[in-house]
Structure formats: C-alpha cells, structure tokens
Amino acid sequence: MNYIHCLNNISAQGTDLLTSDYELTDNIEAAQGILVRSAGMLDMEFSENLLAIARAGAGVNNIPLERCAEEGIVVFNTPGANANAVKELVLCGMLLASRGIVGGIEWCKENAEDPAIGKTAEKAKKQFAGREIKGKTLGVIGLGAIGAEVANAALGLGMEVMGYDPFVSVNAAWKVLPAVQHVTDLADIYRECDYITIHVPAVSGTIGMIDEAACALMKEGVVFLNFSRDTLVDAPAMASALASGKVGCYVTDFATPEVMAMENAIVLPHLGASTEEAEDNCARMAVVELMDYIDNGNIVNSVNYPACQAGVCPEGMFRIAVLYNSSDLAMGSVTEILEPIVAEFDMVDNQRDEHGYALITLTENLADEVLERIAELDGAYLVRRVK
C-alpha cells in the first residue's frame, strides 16, 4: 500500500483518482507522496519513506527543491492546469486598470443613500472615464502556459501583442499565435507597450527584475500587471514609479504591506488560480503525476529532476530507478554491476543540471544486495525498486 498525505485541502476531483493501491493518511511520516498547494515546506524534515511531492499549482517557492533533489525526492508541479483561470484574471486586471471600475464601484457605495443617485451618477461618471484596450499594445514577459494564453486572448480583444521569452520551449512556442510579435530584447517591451504582464518563475535571475532601471525604460503611464510572484517586482522602485506617474497603475495578485501603501495600485488577495475548475485541474494533474512516478518510475513535469519516461513496466519484467548526482556518478558504474548479473536490461537516463535520473527495466528481479551495491556508489542519492 502506498500512502499519500495532503498538506492542504486537495480537490476530491484529484484524490478520487487514487487507485486501490493508494490510501490517504494523516501520518506524514508514513507517506510515500505528499500533495501540497501553498503550505510552507522550506523548513520541513522529510521521512525516508517520502518519494515525491506534487504541487497542485505552478509555483514551487514553498518547497526546498535542491534539498529534495539531494534526498532523492522528486518534486512535481502542474504547469498549465490553472492557465485559463490566471489568464481570465489578467484580462480582468487590464480592464480594472483602464475603465475606472474600482473607483466607480466605491463612488456608488459611498452615495448609496442618495435618493437621486441616478441623476448624480450621470454628473459624477466623468471622473471615472477610462480608455479602451483595443488597439493598445500588450507586452507579455514569459510565454509559458499562462503567458501564451494571455497573449492569444489579447489578440482576440484587438490588442497588439509583443512577447519576450528567451527560454521558451518548442511546445510552448507552437501554442503562441503567429500574430504575436516575438522580441529578443526585453527593453523593447518596456519602451513600446501600454500594458505589460509578467509570467515567469521567481528564481535567482528574475527576482527583483522589475527594478528602477526597468521602470525608467517604460512608457509614461504604463499599466503593469503581476500575477506571477510578488518578488519579481522591486517594491520601492514600483512605489516610486507610481508616485511619479511613470507607471499609471500596478495590478498585482499579491498583497503585501509595501504594496498596500502604494498609490494607484489595484491589489487582489492571490485569486489567480482560485477557481473550482483550476483547483480541480491542478489536483487531477498532481495525482496522476504522483502515481505514475510511484508506480512506473516515470517523471513528467518535475522541477528538480529531468523528464524521464519508460512507460508501464511490461508483465514479467522488473524495474529500478536510480537518482544520482551526475557530477559524481556515471551510469557506466551501474552497468558494470548489472552486466554480469542480468542477461538483458534497458536503460533510460537523463540529466538536469547536476541531478540525474535513470530508469532501468530488467528481465530479472535484482536481489537486495545488488541494489545496495548501486546505492553505495559515490553520488547515488537513492536507488528504488519500482517493480
């Protein structure tokens, strides 16, 4: 029996997919897999039973990825599962920033007792006059699952769209409509766009990237939208740009004390993926990834190990997985152990940065002492009998 622990409430649309070989448990120490949304895991100590963590969502800055990798724990996320939900809120954010909607709603609430509010509103509405987004230029920084959907939807609303992503995958690039203008210099986005939305992960190269220098390059009165991570934007730089009018409005899904003090900021309480559909999609995807890894050893959508797939282990065959440091361990050392023992085996071996993963399907079931010999090799994080 495999045990799964949920650190957050996970949609039953996902947990109902668990087969009879799986059982939910409140005992995290016994769990082979953990399902998580936003719970903080950075300071957690992990049991030796734990094989994998699946994040029902895209962001993984609540999980210690490198430490997990070194402990042989594969971390998954669910890219694209919440893309439509976030896309819709980005479009909403552009409209909120453009049409005086927030101020108009507040005015109506403040004047709710006015018996002649209909006539008064006709006089007051001019202070909330806005601009249409049709014909304006949107810059999309990051053309992954969410960025691609935002770019395509903006085209449908009559906007000109520019996209920047030096790391875009081939699969992601195919999802972006040809009318999206790809640029190779981020400064072009800053200089030419009326609206800018950012959709990149918070990593060492992107944290604080929207700084004073970036804001200085932007068009006067630009609307900047951040539905990715709060740390991408340097708060003092954004506050200064808003105060000067360089940035006309900052729309963010991340409420912080610094942002709440900014003028002309529209702040939402992290609603990007907060829809029933997104939560269901993320939960289903996370559970499928977790089971496929535990049952078959396949890795799809990991954020700390390479993708590696060998399908379902055929009847009558056996399979082991080796998680290792590719700087210290070469798979030749493993084959040297296996070749005198096993008549035939097939290996799929991939690396991601310094972390490697090998799936080995064999005609014979290996004795425990053979697995122990592999596990004792320098650089081996974990050797697991999959089947």
Regions found by a protein language model. Name each.
Residues M1-T78, D211, L217, D234, ...:
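An N-terminal-biased, well-structured beta-alpha scaffold segment characteristic
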Residues K87-E106, N152-M159, M285-N298, T335:
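Oxidoreductase and adenylate-handling cofactor-binding alpha/beta cores
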Residues G147-A148:
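N-terminal Rossmann-fold NAD(P) dinucleotide-binding loop
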Residues L271-K387:
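NAD(P)-dependent dehydrogenase/reductase Rossmann-like domain
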